[in-house]
Regions:
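Polyanion-binding surfaces on beta-sheet-dominated domains and ring/shell assemblies
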Residues: 1-146
């Protein structure tokens, strides 16, 4: 990124959003599709953070809503002037998940919440990502409904 004049945080974010190419580096063997994780996004955004003299901080907290627990992930982009842009995303912890203990369930919800906070901050569209739309064979055909 050329430094002709000082750019504000929104211009830096726009540069990052325009130049970020986050590949779908993970494979879901069950559904046989590729998807991107928070780690994939972080790996590709780091050089752009360096180029724009920005930093990224991601944090989690647990929110109780009714009898359910949600992980709230916050992604904050900060520049050298300490100007910030912040995005928050939530993921609900499953009540139980086969083969997972409580810590793994929370970790899984944290990963999803972080991914979606990063998606929001960096304008990554996952609507074509099977991880966001896969029903794992539970979809209903139109003729089944009629």
């Amino acid at each position: 990124m050329e430094k002709k004049e000082e750019q504000n945080i929104r211009a830096k974010l726009g540069y990052i959003q325009t130049n970020l190419k986050a590949p779908k580096g993970q494979l879901n063997k069950f559904g046989n599709y590729r998807y991107r994780s928070a780690e994939d996004i972080l790996e590709t955004v780091k050089p752009l953070l360096l180029a724009t003299n920005c930093s990224l901080v991601i944090s989690d907290s647990i929110q109780g809503i009714g009898d359910r627990h949600y992980v709230m992930a916050t992604a904050t982009l900060m520049d050298e002037n300490k100007d910030t842009v912040t995005v928050t995303a939530y993921a609900r912890e499953a009540a139980e998940k086969k083969g997972m203990d409580a810590a793994q369930i929370t970790g899984s919800a944290s990963s999803y919440a972080r991914k979606y906070a990063l998606n929001g901050l960096f304008a990554i569209d996952d609507t074509k990502d099977p991880d966001a739309t896969n029903t794992h064979g539970k979809e209903r055909k139109v003729q089944d409904i009629l």
